[in-house]
Amino acid sequence: MSTAPALPPLPGAPGGPALPSVEELLADAVAVAVPMRVRFRGTDLRHALLLRGPAGWAEFSPFPEYGPHECAAWLAAAIEAGWQGWPGPVRQTVPVNATVPAVAADDVEAVLARYGDGITAVKVKVAEHGPEGGLVPGSREADLARVRRVRALLPHAQVRVDANAGWTPAEAVDVLTALADVGLEYAEQPVPGITDLAEVRAELRARGVPTPIAADEAVRKAEDPLAVAAAGAADLIVVKV
């Protein structure tokens, strides 16, 4: 229970409920720690605070490295969801891409068949790592075969690859150069870090490889897109919502 003095509720949206005081927030809050099946961003236990408001449950679960000003924005979003609710939908359907995991090329057709007809975009996972870290043996050849199989099956679809920061700059340049004839829509986070992304992007341009570079894991905080742009590290950013 908080020892902070009672604070008056903040005004809510016009016509909506007032936002809660600290005491009201904590009265029905539930702290949880959920074990993760796969370690992600250095953690295998996800901590969260569940808040119960008049519009429903909300979740406050910033990553551990986030500072107070970043956590404040996350908390404000959680309170807004729980006390004011979500806005009404503006559309009934949203197009999504098919995803091909790091499977053998012979299995690609079966994976794509699960999505039915009309596939217009495919994300292909590449740079598979083993349980002990490091690329699995033969991953380069497997990646090339997998991507080429997707292109052969879907000659008119947009094809993008996602390495989840699994390559070194040299490995990324090597594989993306080899895939230049596939006509990739973009390569998502081929290497870790903004500096490495900028290096890969510059080397591909020097070689005449037109594949755009997308930043994903390198963008986690509000100022990161500016750093990516300043370094010339990417052509686009993948935003998780």
Question: Could you tell me what each predicted segment is?
Answer:
Residues 2-42:
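Short, Gly/Pro- and small/polar-rich lid/capping loops
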Residues 129-241:
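Catalytic core of soluble alpha/beta enzymes
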Residues 34-42, 93-108, 125-128, 133-137, ...:
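Active-site mouth loops of central-metabolism enzymes
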Residues 28-30, 50, 95-97:
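Generic structural signal for residues positioned in beta-strands
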